[in-house]
Amino acid sequence: DDGKTWSKPINITEQVKDPSWYFLLQGPGRGITMQDGTLVFPIQFIDSTRVPNAGIMYSKDRGETWKIHNYARTNTTEAQVAEVEPGVLMLNMRDNRGGSRAVSTTKDFGKTWTEHPSSRKALQEPVCMASLISVKAKDNALNKDILLFSNPNTVKGRHHITIKASLDGGITWLPEHQVMLDEGEGWGYSCLTMI
């Protein structure tokens, strides 16, 4: 009914949170629906050693049940997820080491992760949340699959909010495919989406 009525909320904490973790959060940002209908949200949690970790949680039954496997990279938070090929998820993470984004991919919903070639190299950041979305060829004028990314394009301070496009699956983010929206201070979190 287009959001006029809603079911009662379902508490999924016991399904996904290890009791030894200090907390578990989604995002911030948005989740995705994969081509096969799987719902996926980026997550962050602080483990029993008080170290933050980013990963994903997913549901194959329209949100009735949820699962988490392994984190993608330790000392990371505030991630965004995109399906870059059918069944392949890319997790783009705030890295508390600073300077640049950490990026990993998984083909098995986070049971195993592979560091992406662009990780800690291609996207600078000031230790801040960022946004990542996949835009299919049918939905853009270039007629090719692209990734869009937004963040404060600096290594210190939250300014120069920029949107970047990658035409090669996130390997490169060339200057000619970037638009700076505002160079002023005060820009931090952003969330890209398709409507």
Task: Give the label of every model feature segment.
Residues 1-195:
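Asp-box/BNR beta-propeller blade signature and adjacent active/binding-site loops
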